[in-house]
Regions:
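Glycine-rich phosphate/pyrophosphate-binding loop and the adjoining helix
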Residues: 2-4, 13-15, 57, 139-144
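Short hydrophobic segments within beta-strands
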Residues: 21-23, 51, 109
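A short beta-strand-loop structural module common to alpha/beta enzyme folds
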Residues: 45-55
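N-terminal beta1-alpha1 ligand-phosphate binding loop
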Residues: 15-40
Length: 144
């Protein structure tokens, strides 16, 4: 009998697909997205797709087991391009009303130019969009 997460020798192990997507004008968020993607590559049994939010297709989104979204901070919020990405989930990709992202893992990261630039608020708005689509958002815990 196999335990959770174990695969028998005669079954091919399926890779966990992680979509890392972002918007970046200055290049800072892009560099952070690349670092996140490199981190995913370091985890055995995963594959990563790194794309700007405007280039993500419905197939990219729906085939992912986890979605990590990065944004620069604009007025203590996600960028307009990242907001449009989430709007496209419903209006372009047809995520709702079937909740096609339900139980997929979600995560966020943000870049800001100042110590108190609103990165926490921007990440919370990204995570709120994910939670509204019944995704699973997990925190590492600890002090921030």
């Amino acid at each position: 009998m196999l335990g959770f997460g174990e695969v028998s020798a005669d079954e091919p192990a399926s890779l966990v697909k992680v979509l890392v997507t972002y918007h970046s004008l200055s290049g800072n968020t892009e560099r952070m997205a690349e670092a996140v993607a490199d981190g995913v590559k370091g985890v055995p049994g995963t594959e990563v797709l790194l794309k700007r939010v405007g280039k993500v297709t419905a197939d990219d989104l729906f085939s992912a087991d986890a979605v990590v979204v990065g944004s620069p901070v604009y007025w203590s919020n996600m960028s307009g391009e990242v907001k449009t990405f989430f709007d496209n989930w419903q209006f372009k990709f047809g995520v709702f009303p079937d909740f096609k992202m339900k139980n997929k893992i979600g995560a966020a990261f943000a870049t800001g130019g100042q110590v108190s630039s609103g990165k926490e608020v921007a990440m919370l708005t990204i995570l709120a969009a994910m939670l509204g689509n019944q995704m699973i958002v997990v925190s590492g815990g600890g002090a921030f």
